[in-house]
C-alpha cells in the first residue's frame, strides 16, 4: 500500500470549505499556505494563478497527497532519472499520490485559477528539483517561491 494510506482516506473524504480562508493568488508564483504542521506531516493549501508551475521535483520519504479543491491542474510524471512517463489532468475532487519510488513530478496550471491541498510526510522537507536530466540542488520548498505560513490548524478537526 501507499505510505500515507490513513491520510489518503481522510483527504479523499474531505469536502470542507475552511480552505477558502487561504484562497489568495499571486501573479509572480504559486502561493503555498502552510495550514498545519506536526511531527508526522505538513499540509498546504496552494493557490495557482494562470499558467504557474513547479519545476520537476521529488518528495519527502513518505510522499505527497494532492487534492484539487477548485479548478484543475496537469501533473507530469517522470522516472527517477527524469524520463517523461505521462501527463494526468487532475480535476476538482481528484486525489493523487506520489512518492520517490513512483518517481518525480511537475505540476502545471493552465489558463485558470486552481486551489490544491498537499500533504507531505515527514514535514519540512526541502525537495530536490531537476532540469532535464540534471539535478539542480536542494531547497525547492520556498526557495524563490511565495511561501506563506499560517498558525491555523484548520485540518486538525479532520483527524490529521
How would you name each of these model-derived features?
Residues 90, 105, 117-123, 132-135, ...:
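Acidic, Ser/Thr/Gly/Pro-rich intrinsically disordered interaction regions
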Residues 65, 77-109:
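Short acidic-glycine-tyrosine-enriched beta hairpin
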Residues 65, 111-126:
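A short hydrophobic beta-strand segment most commonly corresponding to one strand
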Residues 1-20:
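N-terminal leader/capping segments at the start of a protein or of a new domain
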Residues 22-52:
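A short glycine-rich, His/Asp/Glu-containing loop-to-beta-strand
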Residues 55-61:
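Histidine-centered catalytic micro-motifs
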Residues 50, 61-79:
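Glycine- and acidic-residue-biased ligand/ion/polar-headgroup-sensing regions
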Residues 15-17, 128-153, 158:
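Asparagine/serine/threonine-enriched low-complexity, disordered tracts
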Amino acid at each position: 500500500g501507499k505510505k500515507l494510506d490513513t491520510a489518503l482516506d481522510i483527504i479523499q473524504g474531505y469536502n470542507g470549505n475552511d480552505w477558502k480562508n487561504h484562497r489568495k493568488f499571486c501573479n509572480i508564483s504559486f502561493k503555498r499556505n502552510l495550514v498545519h504542521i506536526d511531527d508526522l506531516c505538513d499540509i498546504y493549501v496552494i493557490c495557482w494563478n494562470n499558467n504557474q508551475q513547479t519545476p520537476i521535483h521529488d518528495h519527502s520519504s513518505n510522499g505527497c497527497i494532492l487534492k484539487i479543491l477548485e479548478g484543475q491542474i496537469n501533473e507530469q510524471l517522470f522516472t527517477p532519472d527524469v524520463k517523461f512517463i505521462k501527463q494526468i489532468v487532475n480535476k476538482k475532487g481528484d486525489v493523487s499520490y506520489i512518492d520517490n519510488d513512483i518517481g518525480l513530478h511537475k505540476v502545471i496550471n493552465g489558463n485558470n485559477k486552481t486551489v490544491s491541498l498537499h500533504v507531505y510526510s515527514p514535514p519540512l522537507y526541502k525537495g530536490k528539483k531537476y532540469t532535464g536530466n540534471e539535478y539542480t540542488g536542494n531547497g525547492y520548498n520556498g526557495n524563490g517561491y511565495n511561501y506563506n505560513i499560517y498558525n491555523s490548524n484548520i485540518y486538525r478537526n479532520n483527524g490529521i
